[in-house]
From Swiss-Prot:
Pathway linked to the protein: Carbohydrate degradation; glycolysis; D-glyceraldehyde 3-phosphate and glycerone phosphate from D-glucose: step 3/4
Family the entry assigns: Belongs to the phosphofructokinase type A (PFKA) family. ATP-dependent PFK group I subfamily. Prokaryotic clade 'B1' sub-subfamily.
HAMAP family: Phosphofructokinase_I_B1
Alphabetized GO MF terms: 6-phosphofructokinase activity; AMP binding; ATP binding; fructose-6-phosphate binding; identical protein binding; metal ion binding; monosaccharide binding
Active site (UniProt): 127 (proton acceptor)
The organism's place on the tree of life at top rank: Bacteria
Binding site for Mg(2+): 103
Protein known as: ATP-dependent 6-phosphofructokinase
GO biological process: canonical glycolysis; fructose 1,6-bisphosphate metabolic process; fructose 6-phosphate metabolic process
Species assigned in the record: Listeria monocytogenes serotype 4b (strain CLIP80459)
Function: Catalyzes the phosphorylation of D-fructose 6-phosphate to fructose 1,6-bisphosphate by ATP, the first committing step of glycolysis.
Activity control note: Allosterically activated by ADP and other diphosphonucleosides, and allosterically inhibited by phosphoenolpyruvate.
Amino acid sequence: MKRIAILTSGGDAPGMNAATRAVVRKAIYEGLEVYGINYGFLGLVNGDIRKLELGSVGDLLHRGGTFLYSARYPEFATEEGQLKGIEQLKKHQIDGLVVIGGDGSYHGAEALTKRGFPTIGIPGTIDNDISGTDFTIGFDTALNTVLDALDKIRDTATSHERTFIIEVMGRDAGDIALWSGLAGGAEAIIVPEESFNMDDVVDRLNKGRERGKKHSIIVVAEGVMSGNEFAKQLAEYGDYHARVTVLGHVQRGGSPTAFDRVLASRLGARSVELLLENRGGLAVGIRENRIVENDISEILKEKHTLDQKLFDLASILSI
């Protein structure tokens, strides 16, 4: 192993730059050459590849987004796309690849591994929906972004004695909604993994009113329904004319938290070590504060599950 490359793919997440920095600096420390691939798998197929030096990743640790850029390239799922990618890797004499991203990125990494090219996956997505790790890079930052918004919205909800609905990201996973809702004291948390009944939500709000509570916050993951649709349905149950805030892509941006920076640094460094050990087809992660690695194929077979105990706790504490 003399030369490795790194790419970021799919939705950007705060901490991707920190992980890239760790890969580059760890690799150079170990005597390797490092190349950056712009625009993910699309850039790989197009040969958009550049050499990275120590200075290339300076002033990156605190920056959100990804300086390697990102793009979605579904054509990489085809044999033609994969063979073009391997052709470019061989052309640049690259011996191993690190891929930072979510589920779709892992599928690309798995495909390259099956074709004999050593590839390591690093979980980078704000949704925290990758198996084999307690946390993904970017989740903690997104969580704190949502919590900051929730706290500010509660101020105005209290002042005007209103119900507010906050729509957060989470197409298939409700971790952002659950963790931010618990941390922010939301009166109701609606996630894709748990069925809900509007009668139960209204009953919870009514009981709060009976105790003198004059405002409430409901956090809704986008994968369940839009915040506006939820507000429309809620309005059919009486005088709950809620205001809606859609946080949208603000959740993806911003300077990564200390947790995400440290996590990204640890995962990035470990991915280089695995390539030096000639161990491809793995995804790194963190379990109980220990860095672990698992077979990417096995990770893709597993479905991320919501922390049921945490969900139950949030329900208990929101009364």
